[in-house]
Amino acid sequence: MPLLLLSALLPFSLMAGPTPSTGKELSAASFLQDILQRYGENESLSMPQLQSLLENLEVGKGGGNQRNMSQCLSSSTLFAAHNLTSGSVVDAEGFQSFCPTILQQLETRACQESPAFQNETTPGAEGRPSPGEVWGYGFLCVTVISLCSLFGAGVVPFMKKACYKRLLLFCIALAIGTLFSNALFQLIPEAFGFNPLEDSYVFTSSVIFGGFYLFFFTEKVLKMMLKQKHEHGHSHYSADTSKRDAEEGVTEKLQNGDLDHMIPPPHGSESDLRGDEKAVQQQDLPGQQSSCYWLKGIRYSDIGTLAWMITLSDGLHNFIDGLAIGASFTVSVFQGVSTSIAILCEEFPHELGDFVILLNAGMSIPQALFFNFLSACCCYLGLAFGILAGSHFSSNWIFALAGGMFLYIALSDMFPEMNEVSKEDEEGGRAFSAFMIQNAGLLTGFAIMLLLTTFSGQIQLG
């Protein structure tokens, strides 16, 4: 049946004649004539017209990808190679001799922009999240992080339990692992314009973490061995350690969870001392009496200066955290979620420690919750600035700033805090258990960021 239909239609197709063409029969010269007609006049090209052709082909920019062996030549260099001056006119024959030069520059991709340059100069590249996704996911993550400031009141009854100290030690080690790894795997490479799917830097970043972990492991093992060797000798810790920690305030509270040890008032005034005693006594009151006390509150004049210093510094810290989150979400939802996870792991022990300090400085529990949450809300302000800066300017500088901040917090702030929290276990003969908890937290944080970076191409968010 199809053959019969085809044989019936064949005579009509032959009668219709050949398919109309747009002009002359197609030949090799047709392509050359088409170029000369579209870019030139009278089947010839002037130098500005030839320059326009090179710009459309992205050839002749001079100074392209330095990784390629072939050099990206400027248009003036290409013209000089063919003895062309500013007043020259290229006819069909001259353009045929010029074509191999264009073909060589295109084939070697010498003038192709590097991924880092494209990432920095094309902020509206395809694949970036929409403004609704950026603001929506950003506010969601910041809200979850800010709620960590309210968890402090829930753990107050457990602060004298042994499990609290071990949980706090694990959380601090987890924060170090996630912050350090997030800076190595995502923030710093993003600042340089690297892509984990194209640039093989993940293994190199893992080696950097390996060097850090190797020295940490060696130092801890050597200390445990030397302590066992000299356990009957002199003590390495002075007798006034607790007094020194009382003056410093922060590490003592995180280590012992002891709200009975108060920070001395700044001027020794009776009102400050009375306010501090009330802050401690409220922890030992029965449930109903404590509730009535919360409703009274404490006069702001009775609150120590340390509380206001902690609130202001924590607000600035949270602002920079929000800045990093906002800039990350402008790049991709995945990048923003990864940065938020690292900050969340750091915020839980940090906000818990701040809550204890505010109580010891003379605040009531409602006041400590309010000001701790108020400083946490500064993260929203940083988020807005980060989104606006990342949407209209290059976010590489924000990633560089956040990467340096994460490294400082992890190594200079959280790491000594982890050592202070584990000091009691080390002095009490439980150094090995504390060492294992530290290892579990560090390696867990590292593994989370490594897996997120390695499988970033398979994880679809937004």
Swiss-Prot record:
Short motif (XEXPHE-motif): ranges: 346-351
InterPro entries: ZIP (IPR003689), ZIP_Transporter (IPR050799)
Cytoplasmic side, ranges: 160-167, 223-322, 389-396, 453-462
Membrane topology summary: Multi-pass membrane protein
Annotated signal peptide: 1-16
Keywords, alphabetical: Cell membrane, Endosome, Glycoprotein, Ion transport, Lysosome, Membrane, Signal, Transmembrane, Transmembrane helix, Transport, Zinc, Zinc transport
GO MF assignments: cadmium ion transmembrane transporter activity; iron ion transmembrane transporter activity; manganese ion transmembrane transporter activity; monoatomic anion:monoatomic cation symporter activity; zinc ion transmembrane transporter activity
Comp. bias intervals (Basic and acidic residues): 241-251, 269-279
UniProt catalytic activity: Zn(2+)(out) + 2 hydrogencarbonate(out) = Zn(2+)(in) + 2 hydrogencarbonate(in); Mn(2+)(out) + 2 hydrogencarbonate(out) = Mn(2+)(in) + 2 hydrogencarbonate(in); Fe(2+)(out) + 2 hydrogencarbonate(out) = Fe(2+)(in) + 2 hydrogencarbonate(in); Cd(2+)(out) + 2 hydrogencarbonate(out) = Cd(2+)(in) + 2 hydrogencarbonate(in)
Extracellular topological domain residue ranges: 17-138, 189-201, 344-367, 418-431
Motif HHHGHXHX-motif: where in chain: 230-237
Glycosylated sites: N42, N68, N83, N119
Subcellular location field: Cell membrane; Apical cell membrane; Basolateral cell membrane; Early endosome membrane
BP term (GO), one: zinc ion transmembrane transport
Family affiliation: Belongs to the ZIP transporter (TC 2.A.5) family.
Quaternary structure and interacting proteins, as annotated: Homotrimer.
Protein name: Metal cation symporter ZIP14
Organism: Xenopus tropicalis
Organismal lineage: Eukaryota, Metazoa, Chordata, Craniata, Vertebrata
